[in-house]
C-alpha cells in the first residue's frame, strides 16, 4: 500500500479552502480512569486536546478546525476552551455518543463554513498522530476517493470465538488492518452515511463504531492509506503511561 499523491496537493490553496478537520474531544474517558474528560488529561503540562490540535495545525491542510467538547465545559474543563482558542478552533458541544458529536460538528461547520467539501474526523485520544498522516488522507480525497482511512498491519494473531469462548477461526493477518484516525470523507458522503444509519435496526446500528463503518453500511467504498504507530489510541491507564514515557517533552516530530 503505497501512496504517490502529488505533495503539492498538501499545500494547495484551493484544497485548504475546502477542507476542515474535526477533533473529537467530548469523550468521558471512563476507561482511562481519570477524574476528568479524556481531552483534558495532562501529558507533560499540556492537555491531550492541545497535543492533538498541535499536530492537526502542523499538517497545514485545513481551512477550519472544529473541536467538540463535553457539556458544561466552561465549568468542568475550561482549559479545553483555552486550548481551542489558541488554535483558533470552532468549538461545539459534543453529544452522548461519538456519532452525535460528529453530527454536531458537521452542523457547526455547515453554519460557519458552508463551502467545506472535505472533512477529516480525528480522535483526540490519538493525540500524537504525525501531521503527514493528515496530509496523506487529505491528498487521497483530492484524487477522487470519497472515504479514506489510515491503517497499520495487525501484529497479533487474531482469533474469532463463539458465545462460550471457543475458538471458531483464525483470520489471516495479511487481510487485516488496524484502523486509526483521522478518517477523511467528502462531507456529503459522510452526512448521507449518518442519515442512512438512522434507518437501520438498532441491533445493526449499535455495531457501527466509527464513521468509516457508517460509510461502509451506506454502500460506499472506503480507501486505505498508510497510518503510523504514533497514532495509537490513548484509552487505558497503560496507554497514558506509554504516551508520557514516549513524549517527555513536546514531540520532536510534530512538524513532520
Question: What are these language model-derived features?
Answer:
Residues 2-74:
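N-terminal glycine-rich phosphate-binding loop and ensuing alpha1 helix
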Residues 23, 49, 105, 122-123, ...:
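Residue-level signal for inorganic ion chemistry
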Residues 30, 98, 124-128:
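Acidic metal-phosphate-binding loop of nucleotide-sugar-dependent transferases
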Residues 75-80:
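Acidic helix N-cap motif at the loop->helix transition within catalytic regions
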Residues 82-118:
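Short phosphate-binding loop-to-helix
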Residues 129-225, 256:
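Conserved core of the sugar-phosphate nucleotidyltransferase
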Amino acid at each position: 500500500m503505497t501512496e504517490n499523491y502529488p505533495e503539492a496537493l498538501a499545500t494547495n490553496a484551493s484544497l485548504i479552502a475546502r477542507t476542515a478537520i474535526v477533533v473529537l474531544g467530548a469523550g468521558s474517558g471512563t476507561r482511562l480512569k481519570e477524574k476528568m474528560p479524556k481531552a483534558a488529561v495532562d501529558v507533560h503540562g499540556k492537555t491531550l486536546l492541545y497535543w492533538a490540535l498541535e499536530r492537526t495545525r502542523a499538517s497545514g491542510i485545513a481551512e477550519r478546525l472544529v473541536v467538540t467538547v463535553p457539556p458544561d465545559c466552561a465549568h468542568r474543563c475550561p482549559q479545553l476552551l483555552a486550548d481551542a482558542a489558541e488554535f483558533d478552533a470552532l468549538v461545539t458541544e459534543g453529544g452522548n455518543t461519538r456519532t452525535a458529536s460528529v453530527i454536531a460538528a458537521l452542523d457547526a461547520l455547515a453554519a460557519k463554513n458552508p463551502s467545506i467539501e472535505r472533512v477529516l474526523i480525528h480522535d483526540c485520544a490519538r493525540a500524537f498522530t504525525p501531521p503527514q498522516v493528515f496530509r496523506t488522507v487529505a491528498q487521497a480525497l483530492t484524487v477522487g476517493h470519497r472515504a479514506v482511512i489510515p491503517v497499520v498491519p495487525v501484529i497479533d494473531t487474531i482469533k474469532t470465538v463463539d458465545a462460550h469462548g471457543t475458538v471458531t477461526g483464525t483470520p489471516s493477518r495479511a487481510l487485516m488492518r488496524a484502523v486509526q484516525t483521522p478518517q477523511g470523507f467528502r462531507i456529503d458522503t459522510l452526512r448521507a452515511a449518518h442519515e442512512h444509519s438512522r434507518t437501520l435496526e438498532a441491533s445493526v446500528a449499535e455495531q457501527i463504531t466509527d464513521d468509516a463503518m457508517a460509510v461502509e453500511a451506506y454502500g460506499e467504498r472506503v480507501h486505505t492509506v498508510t497510518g503510523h504507530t504514533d497514532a495509537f489510541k490513548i484509552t487505558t491507564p497503560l496507554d497514558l503511561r506509554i504516551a508520557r514515557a514516549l513524549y517527555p517533552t513536546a514531540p520532536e516530530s510534530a512538524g513532520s
